[in-house]
């Protein structure tokens, strides 16, 4: 391997996150392909629950790379210890599907000298944070947040919208549902809809009072 920063005993975490269709896996693949030019050895992982591509991570433009699938994040340790050649970089795609032990795994890997690339959704279809991703963002040295395009207005799409029978999913539906274009789209904050989402009375009152205030000003 060429003499570069990846060959030194330094570890860190880089997180790529955002909504669906923002190019997270594509960016992860780009970063990994770039390592090939410097002969940097890497190993790719993803949670087994992601059944869209078996033993591969794949971008929506068709690029892909072999990966090791795990049920328990601690299996990452076992896989690394079994390899004949120890990698310098560990990449984890779709990390939001892992349980919260993935946070400790990423921390331990970086502490042990690995460079850790993580790709994950930032929020679920309810527009609420995936806590796994939020915690990784707190411990990562480098964080890159991507956005997509709102399919209604073309503004930055930052919220993943789940669609069932051509309608937005209700708030009380299960968080995890594996899908692609047939199930999900992306909206901006103003076009994202979550039927049945509860709001504190204080927020309801503020929004109502603000609407009335603005309406009264328009009528003057």
Curated annotation (Swiss-Prot):
Output the InterPro entries linked to this UniProt entry: P-loop_NTPase (IPR027417), Thymidine_kinase (IPR001267), Thymidine_kinase_CS (IPR020633)
A GO BP entry is: thymidine metabolic process
E.C. designation(s) = 2.7.1.21
**GO terms for cellular component:** cytosol
Q: Where does Zn(2+) bind?
A: 150, 153, 188, 191
Where, by residue number, does the polypeptide cross the bilayer? none
Name the catalysed reactions: thymidine + ATP = dTMP + ADP + H(+)
Q: Report the main location listed first in the record.
A: cytoplasm
Chain sites annotated for binding ATP: 18-25, 93-96
Can the keyword Metal-binding be found in this entry's annotation? yes
Please give one Pfam family short name: TK
- GO MF annotation list: ATP binding; thymidine kinase activity; zinc ion binding
**Catalytic residues in the record:** 94
Keywords in alphabetical order, please. ATP-binding, Cytoplasm, DNA synthesis, Kinase, Metal-binding, Nucleotide-binding, Transferase, Zinc
Could you tell me where this protein is found in the cell?
A: Cytoplasm
The record's similarity note reads: Belongs to the thymidine kinase family.
What is the name attached to this protein's record? Thymidine kinase
Source taxonomy lineage? Bacteria, Bacillati, Mycoplasmatota, Mycoplasmoidales, Mycoplasmoidaceae
């Amino acid at each position: 391997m060429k003499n570069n920063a990846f060959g030194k005993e330094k570890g860190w975490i880089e997180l790529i996150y955002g909504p669906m269709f923002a190019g997270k896996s594509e960016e992860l693949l780009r970063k990994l392909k770039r390592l090939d030019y410097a002969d940097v050895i890497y190993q790719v992982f993803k949670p087994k629950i992601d059944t869209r591509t078996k033993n591969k991570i794949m971008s929506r433009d068709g690029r892909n790379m072999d990966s090791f699938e795990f049920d328990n994040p601690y299996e990452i340790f076992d896989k690394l210890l079994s390899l004949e050649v120890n990698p310098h970089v560990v990449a984890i795609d779709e990390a939001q599907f892992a349980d919260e032990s993935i946070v400790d795994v990423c921390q331990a890997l970086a502490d042990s000298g690995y460079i850790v690339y993580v790709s994950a959704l930032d929020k679920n279809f309810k527009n609420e944070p995936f806590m796994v991703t939020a915690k990784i963002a707190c411990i990562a040295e480098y964080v890159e947040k991507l956005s997509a395009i709102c399919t209604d207005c073309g503004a930055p799409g930052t919220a993943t919208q789940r669609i069932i029978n051509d309608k937005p999913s209700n708030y009380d539906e299960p968080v995890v549902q594996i899908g692609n274009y047939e199930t999900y789209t992306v909206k901006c904050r103003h076009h994202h809809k979550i039927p049945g989402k509860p709001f504190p009375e204080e927020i309801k009152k503020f929004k109502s009072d603000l609407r009335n205030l603005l309406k009264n000003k328009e009528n003057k």
